[in-house]
Amino acid sequence: MLILKRIFIIRNFIFPFSNCRYASTVPSPRSGISNTNDFFKRIGRDTAEKVNGKFESWDGLFRKSTKTMKKEGIDVRTRKYIASQRNRFKEGFIVKPYPVMVKKNGGERRKRK
């Protein structure tokens, strides 16, 4: 019983914000990216047109969850792409567009033998 109490105390009082999304910091704009439109133009794949007006502020871009993006009508591929580029920007990597990969010969299930 004592062990369970210790685990409860450690989990709830020492690490209260470990699973909190809002505990993370919002990075400052850098390297020619001063607002959300510049960010979306830099990452490519026409994200600036797809999310037009859905991200008003810089904080909103980094605080908005993918569930909120889904409620606003952003499709799955775009949500995943924005989330991955957003995390790369937080980690300090250079933001650049990833090419859309094309399957060869219809994918691995239809692979030529």
Curated annotation (Swiss-Prot):
Function statement: Component of the mitochondrial ribosome (mitoribosome), a dedicated translation machinery responsible for the synthesis of mitochondrial genome-encoded proteins, including at least some of the essential transmembrane subunits of the mitochondrial respiratory chain. The mitoribosomes are attached to the mitochondrial inner membrane and translation products are cotranslationally integrated into the membrane. mS41 is involved in telomere length regulation.
Feature: transit peptide: 1-22
Annotated disulfide bonds: none
Record bears the keyword Transit peptide: yes
Record-linked SMART domains: IGR (SM01238)
Gene Ontology CC entries for this record: mitochondrial small ribosomal subunit; mitochondrion
PANTHER family, per database record: PROTEIN FYV4, MITOCHONDRIAL (PTHR28235), SMALL RIBOSOMAL SUBUNIT PROTEIN MS41 (PTHR28235:SF1)
InterPro entries: Ribosomal_mS41 (IPR039603), SAM_Ribosomal_mS41 (IPR019083)
Species per Swiss-Prot/TrEMBL record: Schizosaccharomyces pombe (strain 972 / ATCC 24843) (Fission yeast)
Subunit structure and binding partners: Component of the mitochondrial small ribosomal subunit (mt-SSU). Mature yeast 74S mitochondrial ribosomes consist of a small (37S) and a large (54S) subunit. The 37S small subunit contains a 15S ribosomal RNA (15S mt-rRNA) and at least 32 different proteins. The 54S large subunit contains a 21S rRNA (21S mt-rRNA) and at least 45 different proteins.
UniProt-recorded name of the protein: Small ribosomal subunit protein mS41
Domain of life: Eukaryota
GO BP: any one term: mitochondrial translation
Protein family membership: Belongs to the mitochondrion-specific ribosomal protein mS41 family.
Keywords: Mitochondrion, Ribonucleoprotein, Ribosomal protein, Transit peptide
Cell compartment(s), UniProt: Mitochondrion
